[in-house]
Structures are given as C-alpha cells and as structure tokens.
Swiss-Prot record:
Matching CDD domains: MoaC_PE
Protein name: Cyclic pyranopterin monophosphate synthase
Keyword terms: Lyase, Molybdenum cofactor biosynthesis
Annotated catalytic residues: D129
Presence of the UniProt keyword Lyase in the record: yes
Pathway: Cofactor biosynthesis; molybdopterin biosynthesis
Binding site residues for substrate: M76, C77, H78, M114, E115
Pfam families: MoaC
Organism: Clostridium acetobutylicum (strain ATCC 824 / DSM 792 / JCM 1419 / IAM 19013 / LMG 5710 / NBRC 13948 / NRRL B-527 / VKM B-1787 / 2291 / W)
Subunit structure: Homohexamer; trimer of dimers.
Amino acid sequence: MSEVFTHINEEGRARMVDVSEKDNTIRQAIASGKISMEKDTLERIKEGTISKGDVLAVAQVGGIMGAKSTSQIIPMCHNILISNCDINFKFDFENSEIEIVAMTKTVGKTGIEMEALTAVSAAALTIYDMCKAIDREMVISDIMLVKKSGGKSGDFERVGL
C-alpha cells in the first residue's frame, strides 16, 4: 500500500487526482454495512407493514441513487460511469439487524469503491428514515469495503468476515 496521499499536492493542499493518462480497466467493488433495530421493527420490515411503504425496495433505490451521487458528496471523487450497482439485504433475526451489501462495477480510469460505500450508507440511511417514527434506537454500523478488483493498486479482499 502506498504511503503517499494522492489527494494532497506539494503545497499540502487538496486536489483531485489526474487520471487522464490511466488505462480503462474493469473495476468492481463490494461494500457492506449493518443497521440494527428493535425486533418488532425488523419483523415489520420483513412483513411489509411499515406505514411509509416497502422499506427495502425504497432502500434499494436510495442505495443506487447514493452510488450515482458519490462525486457530488465526496469532494475529491471523480464523476464516473457506473455500469452496474446491485444492493442486497440479509435479515439477521438473532442480532436484530439487516446487513446491506452493495456491488458496483465500472470500466474506467479510477476505482469504484467510494460508490459501493456510499450505496451502503444511503441504503442504511433510507431504512433509518423510513422506520424512525417507530424506532429511534436504530444504529448504523460496520460500513466497510469488503472487496475490490481492477486498477493499478491491485485487488483487495477483507479477511475474517
């Protein structure tokens, strides 16, 4: 791993990295996160009885919109073409939580990790927003990059998950 901060110039000021000379390559990233909640809230999401509607359907759209908006909310992110974004949810009744997994893909000059992380974050925030009227104890946690492939820096896969 490089110890050079690529988003800082010689004067110590923030900058966007110039990727114009880089090759287009297939790049993919997977990120995950969790939102824990009261057991009744989890049951109501699964049963589809939340008054605002189908929580996971809306969260899926929110996650995709988040991925598409990454360059507008993360200052030094490039605006890249996202060729695929898929959001999945896994119910964990034992721990009273939903795991959110986002996969993003592009063919481009820079990575797509931030889009995957933003997709998970936006999906979790959407779940929170749709359920906050009945559960203010929800906690969003463990948002992380799980895997990435493609690009000059090589592949990464988190171990121990």
